[in-house]
Amino acid sequence: NLNEVAVRFPRATCFAEGTCQDPQLVLMQSDSGVLIDVEVSGNSYYGYEILCELVCEKGTIRLPVAAEPIVRSYLQCGQAIPEDWTNRFVVAYQEELQYWVDYLQGKTDVPGPGAEDGYEACKISDALIKAQTTGQWETVEA
């Protein structure tokens, strides 16, 4: 369970529009003392990318970069970075919807995330919004 959250604002990117503060560093502290940091940039000039790494006591775990071909040609080597989320998550959203349909039809007995999970996410979101405004660590409602 998360008990405290904070949001920090590094130097803003020149690509942020209006009053948007971008990037943002989100910090979340769990009851057991685990510290989670999430770096968010809504105006990444180079494209859409999700990176995730767990740093643990005995090693690290990193999600793989989305499977994209690496092209070597004309003295260059690289791969495309998608413009948005649609290509990366279309299959995941289809599978999630199918799982829900299967549950409604009695084909599986585990419904997945429910109202209580959504309520917990809302409490964390409320604390994060407050932390964006105050610049302080904020307590997540119990």
Language-model features: where?
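Active-site loop of classical SDR/Rossmann-like NAD(P)-dependent oxidoreductases
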Residues: 45, 85-98, 113
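Short polybasic amphipathic segments
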Residues: 52, 68-78
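Short acidic/polar mixed-charge low-complexity motifs
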Residues: 32-34, 57-60, 79, 109, ...
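C-terminal substrate-binding/catalytic lobe of Rossmann-fold NAD(P)-dependent oxidoreductases
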Residues: 46-48, 55, 64-65
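A general structural signal for well-ordered alpha-helical segments in protein cores
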Residues: 71, 94-100, 125-126
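C-terminal helix-rich "cap/oligomerization" subdomain common to oxidoreductases
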Residues: 31, 102-142
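Rossmann-like dinucleotide-binding domain that binds NAD(P)(H)
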Residues: 1-35, 41-46, 116, 120
